[in-house]
């Protein structure tokens, strides 16, 4: 079952991290396995496995988990962790236990993984809030489309979708009636309201609707369903479209949500926040086998510094060019 293998990206590594932690908290000479003429100690096992990719990732996850629990643990309640766990369990239904087992997890290790992710998410969101500027709002406003009322046909087959597109675009066609009859959406829903920053439908579908005028019908929009790895096909009609106000401040609250969502999903920004937390925790690696596990975060500030330097150089170059042109103009006079 494909669904059970996608529990969480990298989730199995936390279970491995727990194994490493257990090794470190036990006497190095403690026997893990005994046999005739030999034994395998905790130290033997640790040295054999510490250089593997799984162990490297596991140690990184363990470090990040401990650091964020220390710095942000009070900001995310255990109740919220339980709620997130229960929601995930409900989504998987009867296959949840199998998904855990296939990923090498127990209920406790999965909850720890969820909590670690929630702590990082909290830290990233708070950092994003502090960096919000009017320029961010204005940029988001430029591509923002206010609420649209739409009718959406969801289909599983491209040829069928093309045929139905012809039907709904025919003169006098009743789009709503055809949509209700033909859609293959599980809940048979065809009526939607959303703005350009919404996530209730695939991004490409919302983008297509945003580009339509009131009364227009889109072409067939093909979207890969991440749950099934199969393409879904959509046809959208915009039945009502709110006029966009000229002042971005009218949408400030909504634009804030959109900007924060974009920032928190940005990998470079996430790494920057994690790097700052690791630096604050003064993480020191004692075993050289794990010397490079934080490398991706060590370069974060350098990238930011390089980007800022580049912008500064461009500004200096531009200013110098303007000064040169000004001097030339005065000389000619």
UniProtKB/Swiss-Prot annotation:
Sequence ranges of Low complexity compositional bias: 323-333
A GO BP annotation: protein folding
Localization, UniProt: Cell membrane
An example Gene Ontology CC term for this record: plasma membrane
Domain of life, source organism: Bacteria
Annotated PpiC domain residues: 145-240
Reactions catalysed: [protein]-peptidylproline (omega=180) = [protein]-peptidylproline (omega=0)
S-diacylglycerol cysteine: lipidated positions: 23
Gene3D superfamilies named among the record's database cross-references: 3.10.50.40
Region (Disordered): 301-333
EC number: 5.2.1.8
Protein keywords: Cell membrane, Isomerase, Lipoprotein, Membrane, Palmitate, Rotamase, Signal
Signal sequence bounds: 1-22
A molecular function (GO) term: peptidyl-prolyl cis-trans isomerase activity
Bias (Basic and acidic residues) ranges: 312-322
NCBIfam families per UniProt: PRK01326.1 (NF002361), PRK12450.1 (NF009105)
Known function: Plays a major role in protein secretion by helping the post-translocational extracellular folding of several secreted proteins.
Recorded family membership: Belongs to the PrsA family.
Protein's recorded name: Foldase protein PrsA
Gene from which this protein is expressed: prsA
């Amino acid at each position: 079952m494909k669904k059970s293998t996608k529990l969480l990206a990298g989730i199995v590594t936390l279970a491995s991290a727990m194994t490493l932690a257990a090794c470190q908290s036990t006497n190095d000479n403690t026997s893990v396995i005994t046999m005739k003429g030999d034994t395998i100690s905790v130290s033997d096992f640790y040295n054999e496995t510490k250089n593997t990719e799984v162990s490297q990732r596991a140690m990184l996850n363990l470090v990040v988990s401990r650091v964020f629990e220390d710095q942000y643990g009070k900001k995310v309640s255990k109740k919220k962790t339980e709620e997130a766990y229960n929601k995930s369990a409900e989504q998987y239904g009867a296959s949840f236990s199998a998904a855990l087992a296939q990923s090498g997890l127990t209920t406790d290790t999965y909850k720890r993984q969820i909590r670690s992710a929630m702590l990082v998410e909290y830290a990233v969101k708070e950092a994003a809030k502090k960096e919000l500027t009017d320029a961010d709002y204005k940029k988001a406003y430029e591509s923002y489309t206010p609420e649209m009322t739409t009718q959406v046909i969801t289909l599983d087959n491209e040829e069928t979708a093309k045929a139905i597109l012809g039907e709904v675009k025919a003169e006098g066609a009743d789009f709503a009636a055809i949509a209700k009859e033909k859609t293959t959406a599980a809940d048979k829903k065809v009526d939607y309201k959303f703005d350009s920053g919404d996530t209730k439908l695939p991004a490409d579908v919302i983008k297509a609707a945003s580009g339509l005028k009131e009364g227009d019908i889109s072409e067939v929009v093909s979207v890969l369903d991440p749950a099934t790895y199969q393409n879904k096909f959509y046809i959208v009609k915009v039945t009502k479209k709110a006029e966009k106000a000229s002042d971005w401040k009218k949408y400030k609250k909504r634009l804030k949500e959109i900007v924060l969502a974009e920032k928190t999903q940005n990998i470079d920004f996430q790494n920057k926040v994690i790097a700052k937390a690791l630096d604050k925790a003064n993480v020191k690696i004692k075993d050289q086998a794990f010397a490079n596990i934080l490398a991706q975060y060590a370069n974060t500030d350098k990238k930011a510094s390089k980007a800022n330097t580049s912008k500064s150089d461009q500004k200096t170059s531009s200013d110098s060019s303007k000064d040169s042109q000004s001097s030339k103009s005065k000389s000619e006079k």
